[in-house]
């Protein structure tokens, strides 16, 4: 049945016209949200009277559904109501009780488990989780939006630009993003390509160095002559903490053996010099030959370092340094010698080792990038140059803390073991000496004479105690020790033997005991008779005995008692014969 939509008041006459009492009740309960929106003013008895004077207009207070949002329906209707009576009716409807009439439906009882919904609300758990994810994603988006571009960081002075002779610039970070001994391993090493641009005129000062490419070194005018590295235009400033050494590893392919060597001694000596060069022949050997003397193609492409690879680089660096230390102790290798000439710094060739075919096996020695920290603040920030980012630019300080926390998870077990050993050594070295303990009155101060006196005192105490013990004679006098002779002891033993033999010899035999009616075994008391075998579970023959059989058994037993055993006169009446 299609009912009309009820938005406002429904008076009695229209209700009478629509349907009878039962269908009206069904209609009001079936219309969920629509019936709630309307303020229903039905009398308790619809059949009572039809005139408006006799109509009872008490409000029927309906129970609100829990799924309905609270007081929205009443608020919506209250805009359409002008009188104060209707508002009071709305307030009366908010209570959960029904005013029962003659034809109103029965009051809905709440179940026993209705209060459980107040405690356990599993439908809200998923909402909480989704809110949590929303909060975290919003925070991440805010952090990402707050990240500044590399150009802004250059303007602020967080990053500095390093210009080569060729006009290309590479950016190094002032933070400790790449510290001593860090290797940059990628499929292609990012190195500046040769161009015919004129270098900017620069004063000769302490500078930061970049590793030139193997092709640049080989194609030079004199392959044997040392190549000078470009310098930064900087001013002289007072000396600052020691230089950072950045290690760039050239990677030729999967067959290239990756080995890193931290050339700290050579870098520390190189700090004092203003102009340094690298031998091109050594660079050729390093970049062109693999582990087994294979020719490797030199790659000239540039590849930027991503922030995600920085942590892996740190870990690679640690493990490579550890493996190099192990190799140094196990293998015989040619030491990396550093010699200074008038032209500048020379680095030794790769460590050679005989291969399987007799060919010299060449290990990779890492090329070193020396970064001068003397004039960090005086570096010019010019955005006109093209930049090829060789090194990784670090984020702001907030992200640094997060990365430090994550990097702590990557520490190897070997490093933890070394830390434990170091801490143990520190604890042992911090143990106080005997003199310190004596000064703090923890150990008493004693000379050799005092120790001898103490020993003598202890010895006299012991001898006095031993001398105070009673002698054997005193114990005999007190009857604690009894004097014993061997003859007396032997006589006592003989006496014991005689006593035992006499007892054994005087024991009567079994026959004598039977004659005296002193029986030893149970079989001597009972005459054994053969009995028929029967099933002890199923067959029970004594249940089949009649009264005459029982009387005969009793008579036989009493006769045996009267003949075999003497019965006392007072108990003879108990042995009388039973008549069958």
UniProtKB/Swiss-Prot annotation:
Residues 337-348 have a biased composition (Low complexity). The keyword Transmembrane helix does not apply. InterPro entries: RPEL_repeat. Binds actin monomers (G actin) and plays a role in multiple processes including the regulation of actin cytoskeleton dynamics, actin stress fibers formation, cell motility and survival, formation of tubules by endothelial cells, and regulation of PPP1CA activity. Involved in the regulation of cortical neuron migration and dendrite arborization. It comes from Rattus norvegicus (Rat). A motif (Nuclear localization signal) lies at residues 108-129. The keyword Cell wall biogenesis/degradation does not apply. Residues 471-494 have a biased composition (Basic and acidic residues). The modification Phosphothreonine is found at residue 104. Binds three actin monomers via the three C-terminal RPEL repeats. PROSITE patterns: RPEL. Changing residue 576 to A: No effect on PPP1CA-binding. This is Phosphatase and actin regulator 1. The modification Phosphoserine is found at residues 67, 78, 467, 505. One of its GO terms (cellular component) is nucleus. Interacts (via RPEL repeats) with ACTA1 and PPP1CA; ACTA1 and PPP1CA compete for the same binding site. RPEL repeats lie at residues 138-163, 422-447, 460-485, 498-523. Residues 331-351, 462-494 are annotated as: Disordered. Changing residue 579 to A: No effect on PPP1CA-binding. It is found in: Cytoplasm; Synapse; Nucleus. Gene3D superfamilies: 6.10.140.1750, 6.10.140.2130. GO terms for biological process: actin cytoskeleton organization; actomyosin structure organization; cell motility; cellular response to mechanical stimulus; cerebral cortex development; dendrite arborization; positive regulation of gene expression; regulation of modification of postsynaptic structure. It comes from the Eukaryota. Disulfide bonds: none annotated. GO terms for molecular function: actin binding; protein phosphatase 1 binding; protein phosphatase inhibitor activity.
């Amino acid at each position: 049945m299609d009912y009309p939509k009820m938005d406002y008041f429904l008076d009695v006459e229209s209700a009478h016209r629509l349907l009878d009492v039962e269908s009206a009740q069904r209609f009001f309960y079936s219309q969920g949200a629509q019936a709630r929106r309307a303020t229903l003013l039905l009398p308790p008895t619809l059949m009572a009277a039809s005139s408006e004077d006799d109509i009872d207009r008490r409000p029927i207070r309906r129970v609100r559904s829990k799924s309905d949002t609270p007081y929205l329906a009443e608020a919506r209707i209250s805009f359409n109501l002008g009188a104060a009576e209707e508002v009071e009716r709305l307030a009366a409807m908010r209570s959960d009780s029904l005013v029962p009439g003659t034809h109103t439906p029965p009051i809905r009882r709440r179940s026993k488990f209705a209060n459980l919904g107040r405690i356990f609300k599993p439908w809200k758990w998923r909402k909480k989780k989704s809110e949590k994810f929303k909060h975290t994603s919003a925070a991440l988006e805010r952090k990402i939006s707050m990240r500044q571009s590399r150009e802004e960081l250059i303007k602020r002075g967080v990053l500095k630009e390093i210009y080569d002779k060729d006009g290309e610039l590479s950016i190094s970070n002032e933070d400790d993003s790449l510290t001593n001994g860090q290797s940059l391993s990628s499929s292609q090493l990012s190195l500046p390509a040769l161009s015919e641009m004129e270098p900017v005129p620069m004063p000769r000062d302490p500078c930061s160095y970049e590793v030139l490419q193997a092709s640049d070194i080989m194609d030079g005018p004199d392959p044997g002559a040392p190549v000078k590295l470009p310098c930064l235009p900087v001013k002289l400033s007072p000396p600052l903490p020691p230089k950072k050494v950045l290690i760039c590893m050239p990677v030729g392919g999967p067959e290239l053996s990756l080995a890193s060597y931290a050339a700290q001694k050579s870098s520390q000596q190189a700090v004092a010099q203003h102009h340094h060069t690298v031998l091109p022949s050594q660079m050729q050997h390093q970049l062109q030959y693999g582990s087994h003397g294979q020719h490797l193609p030199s790659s000239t492409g540039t590849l930027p370092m991503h922030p995600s690879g920085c942590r892996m680089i740190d870990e690679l660096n640690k493990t490579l340094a550890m493996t190099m230390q192990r190799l140094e102790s196990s293998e015989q290798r040619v030491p990396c010698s550093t010699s200074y000439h008038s032209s500048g710094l020379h680095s030794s060739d790769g460590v050679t080792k005989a291969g399987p075919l007799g060919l010299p096996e060449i290990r990779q020695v890492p090329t070193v990038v020396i970064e001068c920290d003397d004039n960090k603040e005086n570096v010019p920030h010019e955005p006109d140059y093209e930049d090829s980012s060789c090194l990784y630019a670090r984020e702001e300080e907030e992200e640094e803390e997060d990365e430090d926390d994550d990097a702590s998870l990557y520490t190897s077990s070997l490093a933890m073991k070394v830390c434990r050993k170091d801490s143990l050594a520190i604890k042992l070295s911090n143990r106080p000496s005997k003199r310190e303990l004596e000064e703090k009155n923890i150990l008493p101060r004693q000379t050799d004479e005092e120790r001898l006196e103490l020993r003598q005192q202890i010895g006299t105490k012991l001898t006095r105690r031993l001398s105070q013990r009673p002698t054997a004679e005193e114990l005999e006098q007190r009857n604690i020790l009894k004097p014993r002779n061997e003859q007396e002891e032997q006589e006592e033993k003989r006496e014991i033997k005689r006593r035992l033999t006499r007892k054994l010899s005087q024991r009567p035999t079994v026959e004598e005991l039977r004659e005296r009616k002193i029986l030893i075994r149970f079989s001597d008391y009972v005459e054994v008779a053969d009995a028929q075998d029967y099933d002890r579970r199923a067959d029970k023959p004594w249940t089949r005995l009649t009264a005459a059989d029982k009387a005969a058994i009793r008579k036989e037993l009493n006769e045996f008692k009267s003949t075999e055993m003497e019965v006392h006169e007072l108990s003879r009446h108990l042995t009388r014969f039973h008549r069958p």
